[in-house]
Curated annotation (Swiss-Prot):
Gene source species: Nitrosomonas eutropha (strain DSM 101675 / C91 / Nm57)
Pathway info: Cofactor biosynthesis; (R)-pantothenate biosynthesis; (R)-pantoate from 3-methyl-2-oxobutanoate: step 1/2
Gene3D superfamilies assigned to the protein according to its UniProt record, in alphabetical order: Phosphoenolpyruvate-binding domains
Family: Belongs to the PanB family.
Residues annotated for 3-methyl-2-oxobutanoate binding in this entry: D50, S51, D89, K118
EC class name: transferase
Catalytic reaction list: 3-methyl-2-oxobutanoate + (6R)-5,10-methylene-5,6,7,8-tetrahydrofolate + H2O = 2-dehydropantoate + (6S)-5,6,7,8-tetrahydrofolate
Gene: panB
Location relative to the cell: Cytoplasm
Pfam families hit by this protein: Pantoate_transf
Protein name as it appears in the record: 3-methyl-2-oxobutanoate hydroxymethyltransferase
Amino acid sequence: MDRPVTKRITVLTLQNIYREKGKIAALTCYDATFAAVLENAGVDILLVGDSLGNVIQGQASTLPVTLDEMIYHVCCVERGTHSVFILADMPFGTFQVSPQEAFRNAVRLMAAGAQMVKVEGGRHMAETIEFLTCRGIPVCAHIGLIPQSVHQLGGYKIQGKTPDGARQLLEDALLLQKAGAAMLVMELIPAALGEEITRSLSIPTIGIGAGAVCSGQVLVLHDMLGISSGTLPRFVKNFMAGADSIQVAVRNYVKAVKTGEFPAHEHMF
């Protein structure tokens, strides 16, 4: 059933879902038309992701995406919605130089309509996250596979497979929570590690290839609809298969996340 138009979901709403042991359903979104469809289908969070570099611009990575481009797409998504929560990626190069520069750039994303910004990186981003949160900007941290560091990581590979790697990611998560992160995205890590981190934190975790115990799930919209070029990653399910409309496919995704049916074993590492 479509969600009736109501006041916008807030950080407190997401925290209440988390405290009540509910699941948070998120999808990427880049324009007003899809934003309205996803909102009406019951998605909780629209992530205006720098993945637009891949699926909208045809880039080989997210690295070329600029702040102005992110602001444009945040504005588009905000105009198409009334109640869904809007999370925006801080693109490569906009938050790494200094906390002060990160704040200036985050302010522009918030002014465009974002309710929270997402920052990729581990413990080295704790100072920046604390700086932002102390100045009124909610932050979602992002650990595991961080696409903006794909060259440093040597490609799109599972992270945290070794005991040392797993321990570092758990420590990173705890440090970022302590710094003030209100939410944590975990990407491409073993399901057992995703569960350990989720149970160790008191903030929601959103998984993408991080197992089923996370507080919620996110997928790239184009992947979930089966319209991305190339082979879909293992952690993706094509919800368009068997659905007679995009609206139905998205509703099926939301239901599968909320009931714990997705991700299934075949989508985990």
